[in-house]
Regions:
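Conserved acidic, small-residue-rich alpha-beta core segments centered on
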Residues: 287-294, 298-389
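Bacterial N-terminal signal peptides
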Residues: 7-17
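Flexible, low-complexity junctional segments that flank or bridge functional domains
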Residues: 22-292, 299, 323, 373
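A generic, residue-level signal for flexible/boundary positions that often mark functional hotspots
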Residues: 8-10, 201, 368
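N-terminal hydrophobic alpha-helix used for membrane targeting or insertion
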Residues: 6-7, 285
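Short, intrinsically disordered, charge-balanced linker/junction segments flanking boundaries
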Residues: 16-22, 387-389
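Hydrophobic alpha-helical membrane context
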Residues: 15, 100-102, 308
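Positively charged n-region of N-terminal signal peptides that target proteins for export
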Residues: 1-5
Length: 389
């Protein structure tokens, strides 16, 4: 995974001053869609691998016809739905500010004062401000008069439709965006009414949006509050080690029974290359009385896939670790992009055991993180350009 902002997109970013479009003036949005489709067809290897071209073009025609009567949020969600029809986990429209310098903020939707997480048995409240702390641990059964399952399904249409694990990881964050909920018929105005259940007892809660300046760390936290906010509680009594913050992009630790290697991005560090870092972890694990290594990729959203060989070859050559029961790899729905390429290589070339959730993407997938910014609405859109297998 890499990040590339197209030349035209960069010009839009530098000149962006915040363009507001009147509800009936759909021409800027028509132009945004035209330019995005030009970029998509020029740079994506196969934009119709998931959705047949005829279906894709029909959806575009329906969106164009509806544009004059749509609100800004409805225009954004409609656009996002078209982008998501491409299907791959590297082609989608973020609903939150991307953590890259020089990009406009995106939709700028206000967020709820609680955080959700989607589990196998439903959507739960896992973080909340002190005022909503009584909601922690409750299962969400509805948004307004819409069942939670239907609400999740509506939002899933805005996320990569072929990369379902990736979509299931991020759908909880999308469900926190108040204007998005209103656009999808899941909220009325700036108030969101949730139906909740715990221990067989049901209740409702009316929630208002946070101030526009409140920003969550969408990428690497699942239950934290807005950045800088101290007024926050989580459902978990203790944060597990793998979710605890650490400096840099990687760490090596000694756990009971194994050396532990975790990285959140596959990249060279300031003082150490990726190859040097992973070689140090392998050497440390080999030096144990009973050599064992755990590689934790549960928070790794990708990086530079060309660096994977440094770890794979080090393990392939290790007689102490490259055997059954000595090497374990942990994965999750956030194991994405170049990290999926690493998982595939480890599966093919080592004796690693894999534990956890299925990865965000398929082993064969469209990748590269290119970022295009629409010229009028200033919405960053991520799109793939290469096929990896």
């Amino acid at each position: 995974m890499s990040r590339l902002v197209t030349t035209s997109a960069l010009a839009f970013v530098l000149s962006f001053g915040g363009t507001a479009c009147a509800k009936n003036d759909d021409a800027p949005w028509q132009e945004d869609l035209n330019v995005f489709l030009e970029v998509l067809h020029a740079e994506h290897d196969n934009p119709y691998f998931h959705t047949p071209r005829a279906d894709f073009e029909l959806a575009i025609a329906d969106y164009r016809a509806a544009l004059p009567g749509l609100s800004r949020a409805e225009r954004i969600t409609g656009f996002a739905r078209i982008v998501a029809m491409v299907g791959d986990g590297h082609t989608w429209m973020p609903m939150y500010r991307l953590p890259f310098d020089g990009l406009p903020p995106g939709p700028g939707f206000a967020s709820l004062p609680i955080r959700f997480e989607l589990f196998d048995d439903g959507l739960y409240v896992v973080g909340a401000s002190h005022a909503q702390a009584d909601l922690l641990g409750t299962r969400v059964t509805g948004f307004g008069d819409v069942p939670a399952e239907e609400a999740v399904a509506r939002v899933m249409e805005l996320l990569p439709q072929d990369a379902t694990n990736f979509a299931r990881e991020f759908v909880a964050e999308w469900l926190m965006q108040v204007e998005l909920l209103e656009a999808l018929g899941l909220a009325a105005g700036d108030k969101v009414t949730l139906s909740l259940e715990r221990g067989g007892e049901s209740r409702t809660a009316d929630l208002a949006a946070l101030d526009a300046g409140a920003m969550y760390n969408w990428v690497f936290s699942m239950d934290d509050g807005p950045m800088g906010q101290q007024d926050w509680q989580t459902a978990a009594e203790q944060q597990p080690f793998w979710l605890q913050a650490f400096d840099g992009h990687s760490r090596i630790a000694e756990l009971e029974g194994a050396t532990y290697l975790q990285f959140t991005e596959i990249r060279d560090g300031e003082d150490q290359t990726f190859a040097e870092m992973v070689r140090a972890a392998v050497t440390q694990a080999e030096a144990r009385d009973e050599p064992a290594l755990i590689i934790d990729l549960r928070r790794c959203l990708g990086g530079d896939g060309t660096l994977n060989e440094g770890l794979v070859s080090a393990l392939e050559e290790s007689d102490a670790l490259n055997r059954d029961g000595r090497l374990m790899v942990l994965t999750s729905r956030s194991t994405h992009s170049a990290a999926v390429m690493l998982v595939s290589a480890l599966e093919q070339r080592t004796a690693a055991r894999f534990v956890g959730q299925a990865t965000a993407d398929r082993p064969n997938h469209y990748g590269e993180t290119n970022i295009f910014v629409t010229p009028n609405s200033a919405l960053p859109i991520i799109h793939a350009s290469e096929y990896y297998q």
